[in-house]
């Protein structure tokens, strides 16, 4: 049976080993969590900058988070080893400085930068980012302008076709128009003369009225049908022109 003191030493040694292993695990897990948080913060910062109207409070909070992680990694000495890997993962034009991202918003709102943002943070190339945003904006404006001009062009073509139709109607000689509609007006005049003759004459009997109307009705009805057919034909010609 082991002595009491020796047993305690063995247990203490095992506990120290387990504690060291647990500490290494916690340190490695914390470094992984910190690296993942840094990556997510950089992505969110980029997305905030790409918005048309970025949220100032959100961008400042994300920038402060990136700044704190950078300070911790510089103190641990892991910033120099991780920075090239991050540069290989994402292009340089996406890792833009937090001060550059928030400078325009600070100038518009008249606010001062957060105390967590200093002058010693990393700076990304601004010249690489500006052409991208300036190239995206005109494309969006051109697409919206083309979408708005589409119905206007259709309206313009419709108005032009109407103007051409009215011009063709105005340029024609009025005598030609009278000749076209002369045949249409003739049966109405015949019907008027028949009605005026019936009203102006003596009041006939019932049999005489029927005899007088019987031979007169077939002629105007047939002529009206033919004239209406001609009128439809003329209207079709005018619509086609």
Curated annotation (Swiss-Prot):
Keywords: Nucleus. Highest levels of expression in the pancreas, thymus, testis, spleen, liver, placenta and leukocytes. Relatively low levels in the lung, kidney, prostate, ovary, small intestine and colon. Hardly detectable, if at all, in the brain, skeletal muscle and heart. It is found in: Nucleus. InterPro entries: E2F-SERTA_domain_protein (IPR052262), SERTA_dom (IPR009263). The keyword Nucleus applies. It comes from the Eukaryota. Residues 30-77 form the SERTA domain. GO terms for cellular component: cytoplasm; cytosol; nucleoplasm; nucleus; plasma membrane. GO terms for molecular function: transcription coactivator activity. Induction: By E2F1. Pfam families: SERTA. Coiled coil: none annotated. Disulfide bonds: none annotated. May participate in the regulation of cell proliferation through the E2F/RB pathway. May be involved in molecular regulation of hematopoietic stem cells and progenitor cell lineage commitment and differentiation. PANTHER family: CELL DIVISION CYCLE ASSOCIATED PROTEIN 4/SERTA DOMAIN-CONTAINING PROTEIN 2, CELL DIVISION CYCLE-ASSOCIATED PROTEIN 4. This is Cell division cycle-associated protein 4. It comes from Homo sapiens. The lineage of its organism: Eukaryota, Metazoa, Chordata, Craniata, Vertebrata.
């Amino acid at each position: 049976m082991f002595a009491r003191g020796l047993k305690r030493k063995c247990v203490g040694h095992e506990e120290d080993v387990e504690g060291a292993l647990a500490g290494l695990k916690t340190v490695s897990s914390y470094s992984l969590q910190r690296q993942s948080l840094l990556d997510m913060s950089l992505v969110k910062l980029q997305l905030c900058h790409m918005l048309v109207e970025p949220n100032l409070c959100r961008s400042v909070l994300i920038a402060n988070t990136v700044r704190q992680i950078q300070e911790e990694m510089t103190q641990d000495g892991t910033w120099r080893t991780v920075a090239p890997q991050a540069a290989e993962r994402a292009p340089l034009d996406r890792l833009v400085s937090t001060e550059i991202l928030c400078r325009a918003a600070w100038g518009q709102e008249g606010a001062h930068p957060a105390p967590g943002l200093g002058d010693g943070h990393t700076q990304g190339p601004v010249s690489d980012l500006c052409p991208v945003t300036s190239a995206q904006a005109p494309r969006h404006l051109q697409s919206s302008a083309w979408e708005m001009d589409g119905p206007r062009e259709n309206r313009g073509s419709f108005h032009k076709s109407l103007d051409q139709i009215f011009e063709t109607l105005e340029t024609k000689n009025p005598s030609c128009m009278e000749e076209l509609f002369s045949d249409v007006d003739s049966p109405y005049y015949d019907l008027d003369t028949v009605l005026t003759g019936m009203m102006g004459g003596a009041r006939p009997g019932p049999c005489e009225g029927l005899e007088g109307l019987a031979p007169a009705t077939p002629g105007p009805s047939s002529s009206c049908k033919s004239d209406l057919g001609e009128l439809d034909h003329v209207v079709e010609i005018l619509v086609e022109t």
